[in-house]
């Protein structure tokens, strides 16, 4: 562990601040430039010391960091250090006992090691990360502001003074909202899928501190009337989510009500704005954009976003407050990134490409992709049986039998090494079977039992066993039948493990079909849309079993299902 000081004076017996940073970035001039110089002039530079953080390899375990932190805290306490700036996420968690680092950016926290709670900890940003992620400049500034304010006794918790003129759980009187030319809006629902969830609350805010939250678990007629007649702009963050839910619950009479869906979408078509879209065009760069409201508004609202996976299990008053902070934060994000988007000439794209695309995406998500239930069930049954047959075939190969014996023997030997007297017999692990989904088992079969050449390796340096590697091995060793069997099994595993379960969870509608309703997102590194819940863009199209999978998708009654393949569109 190295250390450095920032004055020419002799070493002190005590210091106020200790900057802790990874050994690979432990450079005095860089530390001084990024962490010492930004401190207020009233802070004595002689009261600052920097230490390198012990690393036994490129990435360290939580247990290793905890052990080293326990050693370091004793030294820091002996030097009367009051503030620790930890520019490393793993060590920050070790010093505080917290499970996450990034949400605690900008907070002054107590040390979590017993007996040292009097020492304060600040989560810092390593200056080395600035090279590959320019967004870390803001995070570094926030962390240094936290340290500086703590040292000058001016620290205030992020989000402390958010609320101005606010009303929680107001009645259904939306009339006063008409006077505001723009309202940030946000809903809280019992789930992500509008077809399987309910609306609970909706919040509106006309600036970064003032707003109202409405309980909409009951009658929603007044809300629908307000949204229809409101002449201003409605600002959402991730507009597709909120508008999609509002359209379904307020305008659609049933799951297949296309007319109601179109009427609802028309209400929002010319009156919505999206702070996520503005942030997307304002920050789009070579790094994957971080576009969640909680991340974009962190320096404004702080870590208010406790993971709410089931809103029915939290106090309703807490939900109302959470909903209100969302709309205040939405206004903050809009006000922060709109000037940047305008300065960078991004508004034409936002108005004429992004927003129209959002309307199309919302319609896609509400309509969904229909599936024939009978064909889907038959596909699941056939593929399950086929996989069972392939597994039986695989286990019958002499090479696999030999590999399995070796695996069991190694387990017994390893176990017996830990025993002092009683030894387990060779049959102790006979319950273990060869697992075709285990990279270790397959690698042992391919590269030890069969002695095949290692053509590819994983990121960790182990011999690869993925489908691409099996394809190469099959071409090089066409007479080894066990390779063909493994490839067939792998081609089924993703379908049975990922796609079939997602298909079976589709929304069953009145026409007897199940529908997939994926969610599409901007902001991925490739610049394309991404899809989740389920991933509609990764449905098999060219694999061995793709044609069977495609048979599940059918057109609704009186409709045609048409596909267009723009395979070279990005060129």
Task: Please provide the spans of the model-predicted regions.
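A polyanion-binding, active-site-adjacent surface
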Residues: 1-154
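Active-site flanking residues adjacent to catalytic metal/cofactor-binding acidic residues
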Residues: 20-21, 87, 125, 185, ...
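Anionic group-transfer/hydrolysis microenvironments
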Residues: 23, 54, 88-90, 128, ...
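A short acidic (Asp/Glu
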Residues: 29-31, 94-98, 193-199, 244-249, ...
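Metal-dependent phosphoesterase core characteristic of DEDDh/y 3'-5' exonuclease domains
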Residues: 34, 38, 42, 96-131, ...
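Short, basic/hydrophobic alpha-helical segments
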Residues: 67-80, 218-233
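Acidic beta-strand-to-loop metal/phosphate-binding motif
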Residues: 82-89, 184, 232-242, 561-563
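Conserved "right-hand" nucleotidyltransferase catalytic core of DNA-directed polymerases
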Residues: 153-214, 218, 256-270, 288, ...
């Amino acid at each position: 562990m190295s250390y450095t000081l920032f004055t020419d004076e002799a070493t002190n017996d005590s210091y106020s601040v200790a900057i802790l940073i990874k050994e690979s970035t432990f450079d005095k001039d860089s530390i001084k430039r990024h962490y010492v110089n930004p401190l207020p002039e009233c802070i004595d530079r002689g009261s600052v010391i920097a230490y390198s953080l012990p690393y036994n390899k490129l990435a360290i375990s939580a247990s290793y960091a905890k052990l080293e932190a326990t050693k370091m805290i004793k030294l820091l306490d002996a030097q009367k250090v009051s503030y620790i700036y930890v520019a490393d996420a793993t060590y920050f968690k070790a010093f505080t006992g917290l499970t996450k680092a990034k949400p605690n950016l900008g907070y002054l926290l107590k040390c979590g090691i017993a007996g040292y709670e009097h020492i304060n900890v600040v989560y810092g940003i390593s200056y080395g990360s600035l090279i590959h992620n320019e967004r870390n400049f803001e995070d570094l500034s926030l962390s240094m502001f936290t340290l500086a304010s703590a040292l000058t006794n001016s620290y205030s918790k992020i989000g402390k003074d958010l609320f101005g003129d606010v009303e929680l759980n107001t009645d259904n009187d939306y009339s006063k909202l008409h006077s505001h030319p723009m309202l940030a809006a946000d809903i809280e629902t019992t789930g992500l899928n509008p077809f399987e969830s309910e609306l609970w609350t909706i919040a509106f805010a006309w600036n970064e501190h003032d707003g109202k939250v409405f309980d909409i678990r009951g009658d929603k007629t007044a809300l629908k009337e307000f949204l229809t007649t409101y002449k201003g702009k409605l600002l959402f963050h991730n507009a597709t989510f909120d508008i999609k839910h509002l359209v379904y619950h307020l305008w659609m009479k049933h799951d297949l009500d296309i007319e109601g869906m179109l009427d609802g979408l028309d209400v929002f078509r010319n009156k919505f704005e999206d702070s996520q879209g503005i942030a997307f065009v304002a920050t789009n760069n070579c790094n994957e954009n971080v576009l969640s409201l909680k991340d974009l508004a962190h320096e404004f609202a702080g870590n208010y976003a406790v993971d709410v996976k089931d809103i029915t299990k939290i106090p309703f008053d807490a939900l109302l407050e959470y909903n209100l902070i969302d709309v205040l934060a939405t206004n903050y994000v809009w006000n922060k990134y709109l000037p940047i988007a305008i300065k960078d000439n991004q508004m034409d794209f936002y108005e004429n490409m992004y927003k129209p695309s959002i309307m199309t995406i919302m319609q896609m998500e509400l309509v969904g992709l229909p599936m024939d239930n009978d064909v889907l069930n038959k596909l699941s049954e056939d593929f399950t049986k086929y996989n069972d047959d392939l597994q039986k075939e695989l286990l019958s190969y002499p090479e696999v039998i030999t590999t399995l014996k070796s695996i069991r023997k190694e387990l017994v030997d390893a176990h017996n090494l830990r025993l002092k007297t009683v030894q387990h017999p060779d049959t102790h692990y006979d319950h273990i079977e060869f697992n075709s989904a285990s990279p270790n088992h397959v690698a042992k079969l391919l590269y030890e039992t069969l002695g095949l050449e290692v053509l590819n390796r994983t990121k960790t340096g182990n011999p690869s066993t993925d489908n691409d590697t099996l394809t190469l091995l099959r071409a090089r060793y066409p007479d080894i039948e066990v390779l063909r069997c493994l490839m067939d099994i792998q081609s089924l595993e993703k379908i049975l493990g990922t796609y079939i379960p997602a298909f079976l969870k589709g929304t069953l509608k009145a026409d007897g079909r199940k529908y997939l309703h994926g969610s599409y997102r901007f902001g991925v590194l490739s610049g394309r849309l991404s899809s989740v819940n389920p991933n509609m863009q990764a449905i098999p199209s060219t694999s061995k079993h793709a044609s069977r999978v495609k048979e599940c998708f059918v057109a609704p009654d009186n409709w045609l299902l048409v596909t267009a393949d723009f395979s070279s569109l990005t060129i």
